[in-house]
Structure formats: C-alpha cells, structure tokens
Amino acid sequence: MTAYLRPGVFVEETLNPLPPALGSNATSIAGFIGAIDRGPVDVTAINSWSQFTSLYGGYGTSNLVHLAVLLFFSNGGGTCYVRRTVGSGASTSTRSFNDRAEAPASTLRFTSANPGVWGNNINVSIQNSLSGTAVDVIVYYGGTSSTNIVEKFTDLTMGGNDERYLVSVINAQSKYIAAVDLGSGASGVSRLPVTATNQYLTSGSDGSAVTASTIGNDVTAFDVVHNSLILNAPGVTDSTAVAALVNYAENRGDVFVIIDPVSGNVAAQLTTASGYPVSSYAAVYYPKIVIKDPTSTVAGVTLTANPGGALAGIYASTDAARGVFKAPAGITTRLGGAISVASLTNSELDSMNSAAAAVNAIRYITGSGIVAMGARTLNPAYIDKYVPVRRTLIYLRKAMTDLTQFAIFEPNDEKLWRRINASLDGFLRDFWRQGGLRGTAPAQAFFVKCDADNNPQ
C-alpha cells in the first residue's frame, strides 16, 4: 500500500482475487447410450443432427439411438454425448494390398473406421495419380457406381515423411476407413500399393447381440465426460439395466436418468417401475409417442418412438429458458415431433401419480399439444421427489465444487475462508436472484459457512 504523507482521503483500486463467476455448468448436456449399426465406439460429443449422421450414418437396423438424438435436437437440445455400445467380439472389416516390387509383399491395409458388419459394404479403388509417382484412393459405400463414392484422396505416397503420406492423410480425414503401413521392404514407387478396382473390405462383425444388460454395464464409458449429464438409454426398461444406470448416476452425483416407458398398459408400467431403485436421480415417463417415420419417404407413415430423447431436449431447453430449478413439465413443454399419444383416464393418471415409484404422464392437452405433465423422481419420500429439486442440487453441488477448486493446496487460514465465503455467497446470490432459491432476502434463502468451526485443522 502506498504511504501518503499529506492529510486527506485516498482511494485505491484493488482487483478482488476471486475466481471467475460461473456461467452454466452445462446441466443441459445429454448422454445417449445404445446399439448403433456404425460409428465411433468412444464417447463422442455431438452438436447437431447433421454431425450425428455424418459419424453414425443414416437409419439402419437399430434406430433407437438415432430417434432419441433426432428428438433431442428437435426439442431444443444443444449438445449431447453418444456412446455406441457394441457386442463382445465386434471387429472391423479389412483389406490388404501388395506393393509393386518384383517379389510383391504386403504394403498397406485398410480397415473400416470402426467395428461392425457395416464395414463390409465399403470397397476401395486404387488408381495411379496424374504424376505417376503417387496414387489416388477412392472410397465407395453400398455399391460400386459413381453415386456410391463417399470419399476421394489424391496424390498419396508411401513415404512416411512426405506431406501427402497416405496413412497420415487418410487417418486424419476419412470417416470410413483407416490405413496401416505394413512396412514393405520396397522403396520409392515400388512401395506404392498396386492398382485395384472396387476391392471390398471383409470380415467385419457386430459381435454378440447387444442387450439391455450390455448397455447397463457399458454406462461407465461416460466417466470421460466431466459435465453434468441428462442420461437416456433409449428403450431400456429392464430392471437390472436400469439399476445399473441409476447407480451410476447416484455414484457420480451429477447425472440424472430419463427412463423410457414399457410397451404395455399403465398397469404393466407401474409394475415395471416398482422394480426400479428408489432414487431421486431418475424419472420414468409414460406412454410412448407417435411421430412421423423419418425412415420412410411415403407421406403419412408414422412409427411409435420412445420419448426419452424429446424429454432430454425439453430438460435442456427449459434450463436455458428458465433455469434448472424450473420443472421440465407443464403446458409449455410441448414435445416437438410428437403427432399423437395414447389417452390416459383420470384413474390411470391418479395411479401413476400416487404410486411409490411415480410415473410421469405424457398427455395431449387442448391448446397446448402433447406435453409432459409430471415431474416426479423415483424417490417418493422426501423433497427431492421432484425432478427440479434433485437437478438443482446436482447443479449447485457441481457449481460450488468448480468454484472452490482454487482452494486446493492453499493455506487453510482465515484469508482462504474469506475468499471461499465471498465466492459462494456471490454465486448463491445470483442464483437466488434468478429464482432458484426461495426467500425474499438472501438470508432467508441460504447461508455460507467456512470458518474455524468447520475447518478445525
């Protein structure tokens, strides 16, 4: 501090050494897990429907995740993570090529970008480039005509230090194949792969069938995601698999699970839900919804879809518009893409709402359309029986943990306690002003205590 030798009042500006205030801690990010015909097996961030289809392809034999992601983006979702679960023994498709030496040896192997029988639909042509000292690689999918060309790479060499080294270029740019240099002993042009036309990759396998149990056991793949998640395993209703998802959410403490409905009637749904864990980290919705069939080019064709993806989108859009403390339910939560939904009687609605394992209704409301009309978790006993209460607690815990990361390895003294108190007080005041905490004044809404009482050492 400057020492002043003259009388007067002096003001000095000091930047408060607080960590930056948090914006959203990404409570509105979804996670989807299930069987998909093709695509990355690592958990992958997706920001649009077009990005999803570019990586995982169009509709195929297993469309549950496709439909969930489509409905997520159709209902205001912004970012999701996708985990493609594959069966045991799944393998990539392959094709090897010889070099051009007098005694030919294997010089190059192509594999499908990821496992599954889908890779057996890939074929590759290798042509001499115009320079005569390099090759062009043309990738086809689903046929051998020019309309089946999906990628083309030109002027590729087999020199590991070359700018157009075939392996580096293809592995950096292709969404269909990966390349492996097999280390042929030849050099120069002789090391290039021989020319070939429409050589199919073979031996790709989906492995064993992906079951609900497989998906439940695979959920720990989301450990690489450090954001809070709205988790949905499209179509998974098996009690053991659901228990695995819910246990994962509880153990992490920052995941909330949306459980899709069974295909049966209300009684079947209530019976199934009664076998799920008692937990505030999950909610069940019923019934399924009818949407336009995106796989059909015929007008008017519909299909029955799981609502979990749409609801995850509604969770996300409600978070953005109102805050995580607002229930993702009510007449404003219209399920985009839903054309119709089965009617529920008053008696059925009463039983769904009063059950120990509550089931949230999806209903048609005149003037509003098809909306979510329930916000209960699978925990009937306490205040966190409501979805927004549990999700608010998830948000606050994650936000306050992030805000206080700076304190690790700092001296545990009064200076640190003041910083923590100031950081959390400011954050909670902002959350209170937004409507996230009850009370007409901050003192009625929250208190922060970090002092010698709870830091005795």
What are these regions (language model features)?
Residues 81, 148-149, 179, 188, ...:
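Detector for intrinsically disordered, low-structure N-terminal pre-sequences
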Residues 105-172:
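Extended, Lys/Arg-rich, non-catalytic nucleic-acid recognition/anchoring regions
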Residues 212-215:
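Phosphate-interacting basic helix/loop segments used at nucleotide- and nucleic-acid interfaces
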Residues 93, 145-148, 155, 196-198, ...:
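N-terminal compositionally biased, intrinsically disordered segments and leader/signal-like regions
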Residues 186-210:
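Long, low-complexity, polar/charged, intrinsically disordered or flexibly structured peripheral segments
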